[in-house]
Amino acid sequence: MLYGLSAEQDMIAQTVRSFVEKEIYPHEELVERTGEVPNEIAQQIKEKTLELGFYACNFPQSVGCAGLSHVDFALVERELGRGSMALNHFFGRPQNILMACQGEQIDRYLMPAVRGERMDALAMTEPGAGSDIRGMKCSAQRNGGDWVVNGSKHFISGADHADFFIVFIATGEDQTDKGPKKRITAFLVDRGTPGFSVRDGYKSVSHRGYKNMILEFDDCRLPQAQVLGEVDGGFEVMNTWLYATRITVATMSVGRARRVFDYALSYAAEREQFGQKIGKFQGVSFQLADMITEIDAADLLTLAAADRLDKALPSNREIASAKLYASEMLARVTDAAIQIHGGMGLMSDYPLERFWRDARVERIWDGTSEIQRHIISRDLLRALGA
């Protein structure tokens, strides 16, 4: 148990780790080979998560969920990070932006999502708007009492299984000293809505089976009732979601790095060269020491950022630091593990080459490493009035 965690928190982590080992690991090879998660396996994972009481555990008790703190939820995500993203998607963590649902939206979207009856996906990124989210082209124009949407989104994770989507769309533009500034609104869009389609996206080397899809809007008419939150208030909602998601990326990177390290440590303790275990050679032993030190440091950095969220303290810089360090740490750890395994580490008969491929995307999605460095330095300079 790491410093500062209670016995109850340690039990949460152990419970989820056991779940991943029993319910996720056995199916990973199939998903890696086929690029698909069979419906029966997805349903099985979802049902067992509901039985455990962990489904939508990031939602408050007021909607019948576990109401875990940010630290507790980070522990859950850390252990889920050990397993396949394609499979642990069905562990069920709906976007907590849904807490902004009002009126009929609560019964149509929020409650079915937290009960596991409907799955959601969040759509923000566009072909020309990744890090520059205000550069989005997907737009909605008022037409009578409705909104008419045109444009597209891409790299949308979980869209293949989603029943509805939370889509961020430009709904206006303001002129500022720095040029045009888009106003953004969040919309709830049901699969099958006329003028809205979901199609296959790109083939990725990372996280096979965890598909990214393309959403297209062609004069798609959405009533005002589909607006989530306030009109033109989507950017603030999106920013809040992004920072919370960056903690998830950081803590899942820690979990994945621990699994990779376990492989490397076991191999170093068993593999013999020149008449002794390779772990006894200084070169390998120092690599192992560096790996575990970086993993523990990333873990503590991430939990500290989550703790600041729980205490409602300013945390943007701390979250950016955690995401930056943990995602880059994962890359270093997976690379070192490959080196320790030598040629065997690159063979697809073993999981290390998969972990190596999967690690690459963590430095890109939900805010690139460069964006995190920008946030960190910006906050440091702002504190000095610069």
Language-model segment annotations:
Residues 137-139:
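Short, surface-exposed charged micro-motifs
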Residues 1-88, 103-105, 112-117, 130-133, ...:
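Alpha-helical interface subdomain recognition
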Residues 150-198:
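A short core secondary-structure module
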